[in-house]
């Protein structure tokens, strides 16, 4: 039943190694969940703002609903902070994480080295992920992002590679051990399709258009591999709306990143004149679904798939990522960053609305790391880049970006990030949490161990 629509079990064992194979192929009837009653949660929605630290949230709140207002993500009752650090190959702390190690921490419950995707810090071995564990216990699974579906944050759920750059079959230079010739399972895109989540929505069509170079799909594109595995491949809002839950769905809405919502002048040395953001990006094709739309579509598809699958009491695990908060902060583009943070917040609202109508849904909102943004006095003269914005409530807000020299990419920061939750086991996010602890919260909520 768990493999009802043609999974490829021969791949799974090879991907994950023998130890995990024992774990994930244990018959459902023998799980702790079934011995001890239903899991606390039927479904988990994990929403990740990439690079969305407190400064990024506060800037978006100030600009839109005002300093005294509340975003959707501000309304969750239980909240705390998560550490964000990575480790080196010897396990020593590295105080600033990248998104690959950051996502690996909650996806696997283990910290790893920067750049690595759900493989161990020392031996570079695959580590089982939340999505794999949920899938193999009969939950529907999904991942939604505004980056490439093969980018680091979604990849941490569906793939195991030495380096996050190994997105498609043509991108394997940094991952010799993951090539099929090297005994591995191929690129992130190939592994993601083989992992067979029920719903995959985002950008990255370019990575899926690459030709597989080895293995059973040699000579075909990863998109063709997906179709062969039963995926409906959709490219825009209309096709997404027409997708049916009978088969899994792969949505590829852009060649790489899904185009951002807002635009405006970048931060500059010496600052900018007070300005407003342009809330319509002319570079965004009309048929491109926004993150909240994709989230609602994923929730509907996963709800239907969980229902059809008929595993009693088991709903789904869904991760939703607002990816370009980070991307725009790297570019010191305050309007792009604010628009993406607010688009992410609308996805949070969609998740909360779903949870309202579907009891026993745990909603968790957090980030992978802090970013460069600083909210400065309006008359400050920072050494780095800055921009001054006029907020919706008429305030003047100066945002500074000073973690790199002008012309260079802004850096992540090592601060703890907010985590907030509503639903079963939400209280577990209170206080200061280790960045790996979300793995335990989700596995406990869904009864995965
Ligand atoms: Mg990301
Ligand atoms: Zn980043």
From Swiss-Prot:
Alphabetical list of PROSITE patterns matching this protein: ALKALINE_PHOSPHATASE
Family classification: Belongs to the alkaline phosphatase family.
EC number(s) from the headed UniProt entry: 3.1.3.39
Cofactor: binding comment: Binds 1 Mg(2+) ion.
Name the UniProt record assigns to this protein: Streptomycin-6-phosphate phosphatase
MF terms in GO: alkaline phosphatase activity; metal ion binding; streptomycin-6-phosphatase activity
Binding-site positions, Mg(2+): 50, 151, 153, 321
Catalysed conversion reaction: streptomycin 6-phosphate + H2O = streptomycin + phosphate
CDD domains registered for this protein in UniProt: ALP
Record-listed Zn(2+) 1 binding positions: 326, 330, 412
Top-level taxon of origin: Bacteria
Function: Specifically cleaves both streptomycin-6-phosphate and, more slowly, streptomycin-3''-phosphate during the biosynthesis of streptomycin.
Biological process according to GO: streptomycin biosynthetic process
Names of required cofactors: Mg(2+); Zn(2+)
UniProt organism field: Streptomyces griseus
Organism taxonomic ancestry: Bacteria, Bacillati, Actinomycetota, Actinomycetes, Kitasatosporales
Gene name as annotated: strK
A Pfam family the protein falls into: Alk_phosphatase
SMART domains reported for this sequence: alkPPc (SM00098)
Record bears the keyword Ribonucleoprotein: no
Annotated residues for binding of Zn(2+) 2: 50, 368-369
Annotated compartments: Secreted
Alphabetized UniProt keyword annotations: Antibiotic biosynthesis, Hydrolase, Magnesium, Metal-binding, Phosphoprotein, Secreted, Signal, Streptomycin biosynthesis, Zinc
Gene3D superfamilies, per the entry: Alkaline Phosphatase, subunit A
Catalytic residues as annotated in Swiss-Prot or TrEMBL: 99
């Amino acid at each position: 039943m768990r493999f009802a629509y043609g999974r490829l079990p021969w791949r799974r064992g090879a991907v994950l190694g023998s130890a995990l194979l024992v774990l994930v192929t244990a018959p459902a009837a023998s799980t702790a969940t079934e011995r001890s009653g239903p899991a606390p949660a039927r479904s988990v929605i994990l929403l990740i703002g990439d690079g969305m630290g407190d400064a990024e949230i506060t800037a978006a709140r100030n600009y839109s609903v005002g300093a005294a207002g509340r975003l959707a993500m501000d309304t969750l009752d239980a909240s705390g902070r998560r550490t964000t650090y990575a480790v080196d190959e010897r396990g020593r702390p590295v105080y600033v994480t990248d998104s690959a190690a950051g996502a690996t921490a909650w996806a696997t419950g283990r910290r790893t080295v920067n750049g690595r995707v759900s493989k161990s810090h020392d031996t570079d071995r695959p580590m089982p992920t939340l999505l794999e564990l949920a899938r193999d216990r009969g939950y529907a699974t999904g991942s939604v992002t505004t980056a490439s579906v093969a980018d680091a944050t979604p990849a941490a759920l569906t793939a195991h590679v030495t380096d996050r750059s190994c997105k498609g079959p043509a991108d394997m230079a940094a991952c010799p051990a993951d090539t099929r010739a090297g005994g591995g399972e191929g690129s992130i895109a190939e592994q993601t399709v083989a992992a067979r989540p029920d719903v995959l929505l985002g950008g990255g069509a370019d990575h899926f258009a690459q030709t597989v170079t080895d293995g059973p799909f040699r000579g075909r594109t990863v998109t063709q591999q997906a179709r062969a595995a039963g995926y409906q491949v959709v490219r825009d809002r209309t096709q997404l709306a027409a997708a049916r839950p009978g088969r899994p769905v792969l949505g590829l809405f852009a060649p790489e990143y899904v185009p951002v919502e807002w635009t405006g002048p970048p931060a500059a040395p010496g600052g900018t004149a007070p300005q407003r953001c342009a809330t319509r990006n002319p570079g965004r094709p009309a048929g491109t679904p926004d993150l909240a739309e994709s989230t609602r579509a994923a929730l509907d598809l996963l709800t239907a798939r969980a229902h059809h699958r008929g595993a009693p009491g088991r709903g789904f695990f869904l991760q939703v990522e607002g990816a370009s908060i980070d991307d725009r902060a790297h570019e010191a583009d305050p309007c792009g960053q604010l628009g993406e943070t607010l688009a992410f917040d609308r996805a949070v609202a969609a998740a909360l609305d779903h949870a309202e109508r579907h009891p026993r849904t745990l909603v968790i909102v957090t980030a992978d790391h802090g970013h460069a943004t600083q909210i400065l006095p309006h008359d400050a003269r920072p050494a780095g880049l800055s921009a001054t914005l006029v907020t919706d409530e008429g305030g003047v807000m100066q945002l500074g970006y000073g973690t790199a020299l002008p012309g260079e990419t802004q850096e992540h920061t090592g601060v703890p990030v907010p985590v907030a939750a509503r639903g079963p086991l939400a209280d577990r996010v209170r206080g200061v949490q280790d960045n790996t602890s979300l793995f335990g919260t989700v596995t406990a909520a869904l009864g995965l161990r």
